[in-house]
Every structure is written in C-alpha cells, then in structure tokens.
C-alpha cells in the first residue's frame, strides 16, 4: 500500500532504503523503493501515476532495481502484493518472482490477503553458504 507522506519523507534519507524514480518532462511519474538488509531486499513500493500507466514504466523501474541489486550483492528480493492485483502479480511473475505463501488479512482498506513473492538473484549454492555461516 502506498506510504503516508511522513513515512516516505523519513525513509528517503535512510541508508537502508534505495529509491529509483522515473522522470518525464521534469516530473516524477513513478518510483520503486527497496529496503535492504544485508544480502536481501524487500521491494517496499512500486508506483506509477495513473495517467502514465501501461507504458512500461513499472517494468523498467523493476528491471533497473533488479540490476542494481545484482550489482550490489543482493541475493534475494521479497515483496508483498494484494492478492487481487493481477497486473502486478503478472509483472512480477514475468520478471522471475515466485509465489511463496499467502498472508491472511495482510492489507487494510479493504481487508485483503497478501501474496509474498521472491526472486532469487544468487544461485542456491551461494545462498546456502551465506545462510550457514
């Protein structure tokens, strides 16, 4: 769910958050944010202004974030998405994300289940060595 303006402002200056933006005609038309923790990252938000949707902006933002993660040692990405958000689930699936499990009643307004998805960026052998250290 989109963050409040206060939460967004507080996180933008924190080192553990990464923000990438899409700009058109000097206006921010979309952004994606990541919370990084060691070798993992949580995709916290992906948003595109309604009038700019269906132009591939979300895809480009997600691809750019995945590339940034690969270059910066992030081995796995996680995210939550509303179960009814078929467009987002389709985008994430096309980029290699897999469903892990359902979080019952995760979202409010309206109350809805969340789908937890992951994308492994490091191979399983590397991830296993990281988790067993």
Q: What residue spans do the PLM features occupy?
A:
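Accessory recognition modules or surfaces
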Residues: 55, 59, 112-121
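Acetyl-CoA-dependent GNAT
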Residues: 1-51, 62-64, 68, 72, ...
């Amino acid at each position: 769910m989109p963050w409040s303006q206060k939460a967004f402002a507080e996180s933008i200056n924190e080192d553990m958050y990464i923000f990438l933006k899409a700009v058109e005609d000097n206006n921010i038309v979309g952004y994606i944010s990541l919370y990084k923790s060691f070798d993992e990252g949580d995709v916290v938000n992906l948003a595109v202004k309604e009038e700019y949707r269906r132009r591939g902006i979300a895809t480009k933002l997600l691809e750019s974030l995945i590339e940034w993660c690969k270059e910066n040692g992030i081995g796995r990405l996680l995210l939550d998405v509303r179960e009814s958000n078929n467009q987002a689930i389709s985008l994430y699936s096309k980029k290699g994300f897999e469903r892990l499990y359902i979080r019952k009643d995760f979202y409010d307004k309206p109350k809805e289940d969340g789908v937890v998805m992951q994308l492994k960026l490091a191979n399983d052998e590397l991830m296993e060595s990281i988790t067993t250290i």
